[in-house]
Amino acid sequence: VSYTYYSLRHLPYTVLMDITVTAKKDITITGASVMEAPDALRDVQNYYNEIDRPHVVISLLTSSAKSPTGKLLMCASNTFLFSEHHGQEPRVIHEMWDNNMHLMKFSRKIRAGETYRYTIAGSSITSAHHDDPLNEAERATIFAKLEGRERLINFHTKAWDELWKSDIQIDGDAQSQQDIHSMMYHLYSFTREGTALSPSPMGLSGLGYNGHVFWDTDLWMFPAVLVLNPAIA
């Protein structure tokens, strides 16, 4: 079993996850997308909708909740992208486990030696970013479903190719080159053109900084971005 995550560069607030399973013997797998709200959040609401059209069926798993202070409304939505043709996809079932937890799942038989891949697309947004975060999260997820996996990854890759046109190249020191590219990748991962948000000091590694911005950003991060990608700066 392998997983690949794509934080889609061309679609803010949207992520794509590939799950690939290779069977060593005949098996039946059950794949599930579980959405659980942390206990600290308030007024959790869970939604499940199926959009059935002649060309597509979309299973939409959505949750919303208020921040601990009640100031912000936070919303998330996701859907499956199957590799089968329309009309041949596995049946999706919705289950409600608790007030703050629900899931959608499917089952599929896989023969020995067969490799099966399915994908989950999801979006998360708050009222700090949009006046109607619930509909915006669902809209972004529906758009990702309609685009399809291949187009999403293609446009994601093209967006990163544009960023890498501005580069730092080091001759004769492969390790330093790799280190610099790693730093650039992580810096770009937490910044975006068209937003006033500052890069997080700890990225996605934890909640300890709670959104605070420190001198690290101005002293170390901003100058490099200003030189490499002024539009982002």
Q: What is the role of each PLM region?
A:
Residues 1-209:
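Acidic/polar, glycine-enriched structural segments that form the non-catalytic walls/loops
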Residues 196, 212, 232-233:
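Short, surface-exposed helix-loop/turn micro-motifs enriched in polar/charged residues
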Residues 206-212, 217, 223:
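Segments forming glycine/polar-rich beta-alpha architectures that bind adenosine-containing cofactors
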